[in-house]
Amino acid sequence: MASPLYSVVLGLAIVSAIVAPTSSTSRGTLLHHGQKRPQPGLRVDLEQVDSGKNLTKYELIKRAIKRGERRMRSINAMLQSSSGIETPVYAGDGEYLMNVAIGTPDSSFSAIMDTGSDLIWTQCEPCTQCFSQPTPIFNPQDSSSFSTLPCESQYCQDLPSETCNNNECQYTYGYGDGSTTQGYMATETFTFETSSVPNIAFGCGEDNQGFGQGNGAGLIGMGWGPLSLPSQLGVGQFSYCMTSYGSSSPSTLALGSAASGVPEGSPSTTLIHSSLNPTYYYITLQGITVGGDNLGIPSSTFQLQDDGTGGMIIDSGTTLTYLPQDAYNAVAQAFTDQINLPTVDESSSGLSTCFQQPSDGSTVQVPEISMQFDGGVLNLGEQNILISPAEGVICLAMGSSSQLGISIFGNIQQQETQVLYDLQNLAVSFVPTQCGAS
């Protein structure tokens, strides 16, 4: 899929409910940025986009890597052109779906959960062009709580690109893989399992081209901008816990009071906001060690520059961790030197540092990789370091980014870890755990 579905990814308990509007013709009373919703506590299951498909574990891995590679390139393209394009371009693809329902009575659909996008959108009837989705396309005429957004509304003004037609706020989003969604902005009641939240601003997509590669019917933006779900709910924190690829257990997303705190001493990193790229969550990486050896990569390698280049983004929808070429080369060389296995070529899978496992089944001593954040050291587990694209082959789950120097902390390095975004205190914390455990 594509990225506002840009490009991506809740078991649920909301502690506060709000009464939905009863008129389908009224504009509705919107909560603008100065107003606070009651702090909800939301917990929702997530599933990997290829879940339920008849694919081998190796096929799952290869598909995820290809999506992540496209997404990384799209993020780079967006950052390169962030200074003056009329129609924004967002990252394509995503990895985790969440089930939601929309309207009164409600209509269920799955959407990509994406920390690299702000807009919430789904396909709407009548469609000029819509892609195939596994659930019925939402028809606003069937809902009593639906209301279009006028052009003067704050949420319309928050769009990076909008037009006005008969006081109807229209949007156009383009994705790095060539996909586009066009439609109009509205508000509607969204239901997460059994709890409903009214007046959520979203895009009603009537012309959606190039999507349909996953199971989703839209996108739930979890980025830092005012149109995202965390911003609209007014929550100060959210967290997710993603299970490893191939796990039968669901991943989870929690918002507000349901996003539990972290144990004292857990590794953390400062969140940095970029005025040039306000959607993304930038984190502060200072160095990397392999097998206990500090590689001497300058911290400036991962710093966000004044012109919007560089920096490290934490992203739910990118599969591998991507580093600037010199940093990646240093990690790959140190890892290769220490693992002491013969190398193999798996470049066709999008992986550059791969090894042949011992034919006798003997145990491989995997060098530990540690990410040195400004708030502590995150020691990656073996499942966060290695990935297997083929029988008897293991690969370093990292890659090199483009000449732009952007770094992305991908979802393999975040799996089996509770990742907490504290938006009030500007920090991300990491708690290694078994995400699928009840």
From Swiss-Prot:
Native species: Nepenthes gracilis (Slender pitcher plant)
Activity regulation field: Inhibited by pepstatin and by diazoacetyl-D,L-norleucine methyl ester (DAN) in the presence of Cu(2+) ions.
Temperature dependence: Optimum temperature is 45 degrees Celsius. Thermostable up to 50 degrees Celsius. Retains 44% of the original activity after incubation for 30 days at 50 degrees Celsius.
InterPro entries, sorted: Aspartic_peptidase_A1, Aspartic_peptidase_AS, Pepsin-like_plant, PEPTIDASE_A1, Peptidase_aspartic_dom_sf, Plant_Aspart_Prot_A1, TAXi_C, TAXi_N
Propeptide, chain numbering: 25-79
Gene3D superfamilies: Acid Proteases
Keywords: Aspartyl protease, Disulfide bond, Glycoprotein, Hydrolase, Protease, Secreted, Signal, Zymogen
Glycosylation-annotated residues: 54
Entry's family note: Belongs to the peptidase A1 family.
Gene name tied to this protein: nep2
Disulfide pairings: 124-127, 130-204, 151-169, 156-164, 241-435, 354-395
pH dependence: Optimum pH is 3.0. Retains 80% and 60% of the original activity after incubation for 30 days at pH 3.0 and pH 4.0 respectively. Unstable at pH higher than 5.0.
EC number: 3.4.23.12
Domain (Peptidase A1) ranges: 96-431
Protein name, UniProt field: Aspartic proteinase nepenthesin-2
Summary of the function given for this chain in its UniProt record: Extracellular proteinase found in the pitcher fluid of carnivorous plants. Digest prey for nitrogen uptake.
Compartment(s) of residence: Secreted
Leader peptide range in chain numbering: 1-24
GO MF terms held by the record: aspartic-type endopeptidase activity
